[in-house]
């Protein structure tokens, strides 16, 4: 039976059980260039079309995998060095806008790719301040995708981070705590308020998905891991990174090598956090996943393999999250080990096809 407050019956893992597993914070014995790839493990590999990833196959063949399961929020907050709990002195929570699509037996919750403008976020937060005025809740956008809620007193409900609830579910997630009913009531009332809002009427007229739900949450991973000295990422969470240098994600590994040189940062002290596969997972779209992965094979995995074989890098790692998450470490010139059997990536970094 699922732990109270978390959901079950979904093809996606229930991250509630990972709360009881200590997250393995990787300590770097030596600096190593890292590709953080959340969402790399597809939950149902048998759904995937044929994947053409020759460079990733080589990395898988000559690399060494070490398992380290991690819920999406733990992975993101740890490796990007996300810090939010210093933003307010008073009690607070967060609100993440969603597009929710209900099916006959499941619900799809999408938070990425909604292209919310700053103006839309401001208008909606202003309206919510009036709508939730009796509770004393004050909404304000930290970014178009993440809003803060200042509370008159600490919340007597707890709900998981947005990163742990997006995707497809047979049962909608719920909060826990003495006032979980207040949380559910507000979630429902806000959803009804959003339904007829002019912002959504305009979005639908423009062919964009409506913002028809809001996820209220307050649970954050407790992480003190030091992020890399230089990170490249387009994730909205990168705005809250403690890394001293955060740049936009490059189009290719050679572009990133040039950026690291311009920043006077050795590339082994840098990392790329590429989260485009998360949106494919949210949508449950294996074809978008396959297309993105095959682009990465040309833009990142092939140049990485060549850099390792030419000894331009002493080593590199690929890390991903999830129930079967972990680290694949590849050493320089490892391709000489010709006796290692060929491997084919089929949706899991550990190389297991189930």
Predicted regions and their residues:
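Extreme N-terminal basic, low-complexity initiation segments
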Residues: 2-8
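…; additionally, a secondary subgroup of soluble metalloenzymes is captured
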Residues: 7, 13-354
């Amino acid at each position: 039976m699922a732990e109270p407050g978390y959901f079950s019956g979904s093809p996606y893992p229930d991250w509630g059980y990972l709360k009881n597993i200590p997250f393995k914070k990787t300590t770097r014995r030596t600096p190593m260039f890292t590709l953080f790839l959340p969402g790399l493990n597809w939950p149902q590999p048998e759904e995937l079309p044929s994947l053409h990833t020759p460079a990733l196959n080589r990395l898988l063949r000559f690399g060494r995998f070490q398992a380290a399961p991690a819920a999406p929020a733990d992975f993101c907050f740890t490796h990007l060095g996300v810090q939010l709990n210093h933003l307010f002195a008073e009690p607070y929570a967060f609100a993440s806008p969603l597009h929710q699509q209900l099916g006959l037996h499941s619900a799809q919750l999408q938070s990425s790719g909604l292209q919310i403008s700053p103006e839309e976020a401001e208008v909606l937060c202003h309206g919510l301040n009036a709508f939730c005025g009796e509770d004393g809740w004050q909404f304000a956008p930290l970014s178009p995708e993440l809003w803060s809620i200042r509370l008159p007193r600490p919340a007597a409900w707890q709900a998981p981070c947005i990163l742990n609830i997006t995707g497809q579910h047979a049962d909608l997630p719920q909060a826990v705590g003495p006032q979980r009913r207040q949380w559910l009531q507000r979630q429902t009332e806000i959803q009804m308020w959003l339904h007829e809002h002019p912002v959504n009427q305009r979005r639908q007229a423009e062919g964009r998905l409506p913002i028809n739900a809001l996820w209220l949450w307050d649970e954050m991973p407790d992480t003190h891991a030091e992020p890399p000295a230089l990170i490249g990422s387009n994730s909205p969470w990168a705005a809250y990174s403690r890394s001293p240098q955060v740049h936009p994600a490059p189009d290719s590994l050679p572009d990133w090598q040039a950026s690291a040189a311009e920043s006077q940062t050795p590339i082994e002290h840098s990392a790329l956090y590429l989260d485009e596969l998360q949106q494919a997972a949210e949508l449950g779209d294996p074809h978008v996943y396959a297309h993105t992965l095959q682009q990465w094979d040309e833009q990142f995995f092939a140049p990485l393999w060549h850099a390792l074989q030419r000894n331009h890098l002493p080593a590199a790692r690929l890390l991903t999250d999830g129930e079967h998450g972990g680290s694949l470490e590849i050493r320089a010139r490892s391709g000489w080990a010709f006796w290692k059997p060929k491997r084919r990536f089929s949706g899991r970094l550990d190389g297991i096809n189930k």
